[in-house]
Amino acid sequence: MNYFPWLTLIVVFPIAAGSLIFFLPHRGNKVTRGYTIYICVLELLLTTYAFCYNFQLDDPLIQLAEDYKWITFFEFDWRLGIDGLSIGPILLTGFITTLATLAARPVTLNSRLFHFLMLAMYSGQIGSFSSRDLLLFFIMWELELIPVYLLLSVWGGKKRLYSATKFILYTAGGSVFLLIGVLGIGLYGSNEPTLNLETLVNRSYPVALEIIFYIGFFIAFAVKLPIIPFHTWLPDTHGEAHYSTCMLLAGILLKMGAYGLIRINMELLPHAHSIFSPWFMIVGTVQIIYAASTSPGQRNLKKRIAYSSVSHMGFIILGIGSITDTGLNGAVLQIISHGLISAALFFLAGTSYDRIRFAYLDEMGGLAIPIPKIFTLFSILSMASLALPGMSGFVAELIVFFGIITSQKFFLMPKIVITFVMAIGMILTPIYSLSMLRQMFYGYKLFNAPNSYFFDSGPRELFVLISILLPVIGIGIYPDFVLSLSADKAEAIISNFFL
C-alpha cells in the first residue's frame, strides 16, 4: 500500500500554488507567466514520477488509493485512486495545460487572474479523472466549469458574453442531471448511503431504475462530449475563446464527457448500457456524417475545426457502444489522440489570427509563402486529423473499426451499414480539412495585399507544435504505448457484460 498521498498532492497543488499568483510582486506579466509555467512543469514532473514508480500496468484494480474522512455527517470521504482508464487522461491534462500556458503568452489583460483560472481548471480536471467518490467527482466536475466561464467571458472575442452564457446554460443544465443521478444512485437501496465507486460497481438495480439513472448520467456527459443535439454550444465557444482556452476545451474538457460515459455509464450501469448500445452505434454514425458534412459550410476557421471535433467524437461513441475491449481501447486511444491533434489545430488557428487578424476563411489566402513554417505544421497536423496512416488518429479509428467488426452484440447487416457510414465519414473528413488548407494557404489574396509581411513561427510556437506532433507520430507508430495502460482495465469492464 502506498502511504504518501501522491494524488492529493497532484490534485491540490495547481490551485494552491495558483492562489499565490496574487501575492507575487508587481513586475509585469513576465513574472506571472514564468511562475505559472514553472508550476505546470513541476506538476507534470510530479505526476509522471508518481505514476512511473507506483503504478503497475498489469493490475486492473485501483492504485495509489487514498481515503480520508471529510464530512462524517453523511459519510462523504476524500477518496482518490487511479487505474488504466484514468492515467492516460491525467497525463494528457498535464501535457496540454503546460503547453496551453506557454501558448497564453500574448494575454496581457488581467494576466494574474487568467493564469490562476488555468491552474484552477487544471486541479478540477485532474480531480475529476482521479475521483473514486461520486459526490467528489461531481464537485470536481463543477469546479472546472467556473474558470472556463470566466476565461470565455473576459478574454474572448466580440460575442464572448453570448458564447459564455450559452456554455454555462448547457453545462449547468447537464450538471443538474448529473447531481440527480449521483444522489439517486448513492441513496438507493440501503440504510447507509454510499458514494464509493468500488462499492457501487458491485451493486445491482431494477432494470427500470437503472435505465433512469443511465439516462440522467448520459445527458450530463452528452452535453460535455458533446453528442448531437447537445453540441451547439461548442462551435460558438471555440469561435470566441482565446486559443489557449480552446486548447484546454478541445484537448481536455470534451474528453471528460467520454471518460464519464466509460467510468459511470459503462462500469456502474452495465445492464442499461447493454440495452442502449445499439443507440450509441446509431448516434455515433450520424454524428460522424452530420458534423463532417456541416464543417465545410463554416466560414470561421475555429468553428470549422470545432465541427471536426464533433465528428471525431463520433468514433469515441462507436467504441463505447461496441461493448468489446478492442472498441473500448480504441475509444481511449481516440481520447488521447484527438486531445493532442485538436489542441495543436486550435493553437495554429490562433497564431494565424494573431498575424493576419482575419477569422474567416474566405478572407484568407496565399499564406503559404509568407509563413512557411506555420503552413508546413498546419498541413501535417491536418493530415493527422484526417487519420493519415502513421499518425495516432489512424490507429485509433482503425481499432474502433475492428471493435465494431468483432462485436458479438450486433448482427452482420448492422455491422456492414455502420462500417459503410464510417467510411463515408472518413471520405468527408479530407474534404473539409483539405479545403481549409486550400482557402488559407493557396492563392494570392493576402500575399498580394499591401502590408502583407507576416512573421513566421518563433521558437515558442515551434516548441509547442513539435511537442504535440512528436507524441502524435509516436502513438501512430507504436500505439501500445497508450494501449498498454488501458488494456487490462478495458477487459475488466467488458467482462461485466457477459457474467
UniProtKB/Swiss-Prot annotation:
Q: Any one Gene Ontology biological process term?
A: ATP synthesis coupled electron transport
Topological relation to the membrane, as annotated: Multi-pass membrane protein
Which is one GO molecular function term here? NADH dehydrogenase (ubiquinone) activity
Q: What Enzyme Commission number(s) does the record list for this chain?
A: 7.1.1.-
Checking Pfam families in the record gives: Proton_antipo_M (PF00361)
What this protein catalyses is:
a plastoquinone + NADH + (n+1) H(+)(in) = a plastoquinol + NAD(+) + n H(+)(out); a plastoquinone + NADPH + (n+1) H(+)(in) = a plastoquinol + NADP(+) + n H(+)(out)
Query: What is one GO cellular-component annotation here?
Result: chloroplast thylakoid membrane
Recorded superkingdom: Eukaryota
Q: Where in the cell is it found?
A: Plastid, Chloroplast thylakoid membrane
Q: Which UniProt keywords apply?
A: Chloroplast, Membrane, NAD, NADP, Plastid, Plastoquinone, Quinone, Thylakoid, Translocase, Transmembrane, Transmembrane helix
Coiled coil spans: none
Family annotation (InterPro entries): NADH_Q_OxRdtase_chain4, NADH_Q_OxRdtase_chainM/4, NADH_UbQ_OxRdtase, ND/Mrp_TM
Q: Where are the transmembrane segments?
A: 4-24, 35-55, 84-104, 111-129, 134-154, 167-187, 208-228, 242-262, 272-292, 305-325, 330-350, 386-406, 416-436, 462-482
**Which EC class heads this enzyme's classification?**
translocase
Q: Give the HAMAP family listed for this entry.
A: NDH1_NuoM
Protein family according to the UniProt entry:
Belongs to the complex I subunit 4 family.
User: Which NCBIfam families does the entry mention?
Assistant: NDH_I_M
* Protein name from the UniProt record: NAD(P)H-quinone oxidoreductase chain 4, chloroplastic
Tell me the classification of the organism that encodes this protein. Eukaryota, Viridiplantae, Streptophyta, Embryophyta, Tracheophyta
Name the encoding gene, please. Answer: ndhD
